UniProtKB/Swiss-Prot annotation:
PROSITE patterns: RIBOSOMAL_L3. It comes from Brucella abortus (strain 2308). It comes from the Bacteria. NCBIfam families: L3_bact. Residues 135-150 have a biased composition (Polar residues). Disulfide bonds: none annotated. One of the primary rRNA binding proteins, it binds directly near the 3'-end of the 23S rRNA, where it nucleates assembly of the 50S subunit. GO terms for biological process: translation. This is Large ribosomal subunit protein uL3. Signal peptide: none annotated. Methylated by PrmB.
Length: 237
């Protein structure tokens, strides 16, 4: 199991494949995605890596976090996230992961926070059909109707579809295809929509319901450098 990455959603556009077909894509950008810390079985009880992306102002970073980033020899990060990995894919602290971590045609799972819609009615939130427009209907056109039964059971069951806060929840979309990557600009183009607004942080992982392509780099797609080469060598042993 490889590490995932943290990317920022830039928006949607379109590209054309070799057959001339129009493909809607979401553009995700990876910016300074470094390994900030390790989690090992001996010390933490599980194996994972903590990644950080973006840049945060030093004055807006707490003293504890400044020490955390200094220990990893990386600049303060705007976003941190942990990814579970197998022991053979554990990355060294300080290495940088690039967009080449994924390959074209690969399936990935993306996780983000959906766009908040505020307090919404049942017709918008749950796609209810609503009531009649006339013939005796009075101000209940968009109402959800009855909420329960009678004295028995005498309550509203949990999970009843009603009006309420819509959106702004953690959403994972599975098996999205990677159309292409651009390592120089740190871009990942994935087919279709991705949960979240423009500028939102998105977690991208290898799909759990699809096999990993044979040409996918292991333990990760790393930036060329002394630390990266050392980590890749250790991972291949």
């Amino acid at each position: 199991m490889r590490s995932g990455v943290i990317a920022q959603k830039l928006g949607m556009t379109r590209v054309y494949n070799d057959a001339g077909e129009h493909v809607p894509v979401t553009v995700l950008r990876m910016e300074n995605c470094h390994v900030v810390a390790q989690r090992t079985v001996e010390k933490n009880g599980y194996t994972a890596v903590q990644l950080g992306v973006g840049m945060a102002k030093v004055k807006n970073t707490s003293k504890a976090m400044r020490g955390h980033f200094a220990k990893a020899e990386v600049e303060p990060k705007a976003k941190l996230a942990e990814f579970r990995v197998s022991p053979d894919n554990l990355l060294e602290v300080g290495v940088e992961i690039t967009a080449e971590h994924f390959v074209a045609g690969q399936k990935v799972d993306v996780t983000g926070t959906s766009i908040g819609k505020g307090f919404a009615g049942v017709m918008k939130r749950h796609n209810f059909g609503g009531h009649r427009a006339s013939h005796g209907n009075s101000i209940t056109h968009r109402s959800h109707g009855s909420t329960g039964q009678r004295q028995d059971p005498g309550k509203v069951f949990k999970g009843k579809k009603m009006a309420g806060h819509m959106g702004q929840t953690r959403v994972t979309t599975q098996n999205i295809e990677v159309v292409s990557t651009d390592s120089d600009r740190g871009l990942i183009l994935v087919r279709g929509a991705v949960p979240g607004s423009k500028g939102a942080w998105i977690l991208v992982r290898d799909a759990v319901k699809a096999s990993l392509p044979e040409n996918a780099p292991k333990p990760a797609g790393l930036r060329a450098g002394a630390k990266a080469e050392a980590a890749a060598t250790e991972g291949g042993e």
